[in-house]
């Protein structure tokens, strides 16, 4: 290997982009097979290969950053820009759901009874489980900030405690959301109200699960002393993502649960 005279990371050839693309093909084909032929074999194969690809790709990134020192300040800056752009793309993703909700609710069609919520729909009480969920996520936003500041100040045990609390609150939120779905008096097939409600809150719930997984990985990495007060972009990205999930929920709560009811 020749001597490197720049701060950029020249990535070694990797099989994971190819396996990731093939797993995406398997998943989309599997969804089609599931919808039309009620067969989930291809979908399960696609999900399994996708999970394995993500695990091994991120494992390689951790090796490159933590053990090989390839993530110089310049590389970290690029990763930060990448994470910011990813979160912006997620904002636009959720914008579509809010657009659908407000388009349907501000000018309800005569077929819905000319009112919102549509005739026959009994919306959930925003002052019960949804308000508890809001409190849980706001508390998790405080604890993740506590964890971040503890890490920057070198208080490892405090960081682990705060991160564990955040993960526990994330799991609690997911369980509350699942119980709310189970007890909801309407379904995703109950017109535009049901579809916009379950798609918007369901995708948010998926993002909470992804964010919780992200934080669990950071917890185990911190147990192995992977983060320092000056080199912890993996945790920083997880914290940014969690704050994004928090903010999206506040908009969902105000729009769909409170105003929409």
Swiss-Prot record:
Keyword Glycoprotein: no
Catalytic activity, as annotated: 4 Fe(II)-[cytochrome c] + O2 + 8 H(+)(in) = 4 Fe(III)-[cytochrome c] + 2 H2O + 4 H(+)(out)
Mitochondrial intermembrane side of membrane: 35-40, 106-128, 184-190, 257-261
Location(s) in or outside the cell: Mitochondrion inner membrane
Enzyme class: translocase
InterPro entries: Cyt_c/ubiquinol_Oxase_su3, Cyt_c_oxase_su3_dom, Cyt_c_oxidase-like_su3, Cyt_c_oxidase_su3-like_sf, Cyt_c_oxidase_su3_a-hlx
Sequence intervals crossing the membrane: 16-34, 41-66, 73-105, 129-152, 156-183, 191-223, 233-256
GO cellular component: mitochondrial inner membrane; respiratory chain complex IV
CDD domains linked to this entry: Cyt_c_Oxidase_III
Keywords carried by this UniProt record: Membrane, Mitochondrion, Mitochondrion inner membrane, Translocase, Transmembrane, Transmembrane helix
Entry membrane topology: Multi-pass membrane protein
GO molecular function, one term: cytochrome-c oxidase activity
Repressor as UniProt keyword: no
EC number: 7.1.1.9
Any single Pfam family the record assigns to this protein: COX3
GO biological process, one term: mitochondrial electron transport, cytochrome c to oxygen
Positions in the Mitochondrial matrix compartment: 1-15, 67-72, 153-155, 224-232
Family: Belongs to the cytochrome c oxidase subunit 3 family.
Its job: Component of the cytochrome c oxidase, the last enzyme in the mitochondrial electron transport chain which drives oxidative phosphorylation. The respiratory chain contains 3 multisubunit complexes succinate dehydrogenase (complex II, CII), ubiquinol-cytochrome c oxidoreductase (cytochrome b-c1 complex, complex III, CIII) and cytochrome c oxidase (complex IV, CIV), that cooperate to transfer electrons derived from NADH and succinate to molecular oxygen, creating an electrochemical gradient over the inner membrane that drives transmembrane transport and the ATP synthase.
Assembly notes: Component of the cytochrome c oxidase (complex IV, CIV), a multisubunit enzyme composed of 14 subunits. The complex is composed of a catalytic core of 3 subunits MT-CO1, MT-CO2 and MT-CO3, encoded in the mitochondrial DNA, and 11 supernumerary subunits COX4I, COX5A, COX5B, COX6A, COX6B, COX6C, COX7A, COX7B, COX7C, COX8 and NDUFA4, which are encoded in the nuclear genome.
Record-given protein name: Cytochrome c oxidase subunit 3
Provenance organism: Tragelaphus strepsiceros (Greater kudu)
Phylogenetic lineage: Eukaryota, Metazoa, Chordata, Craniata, Vertebrata
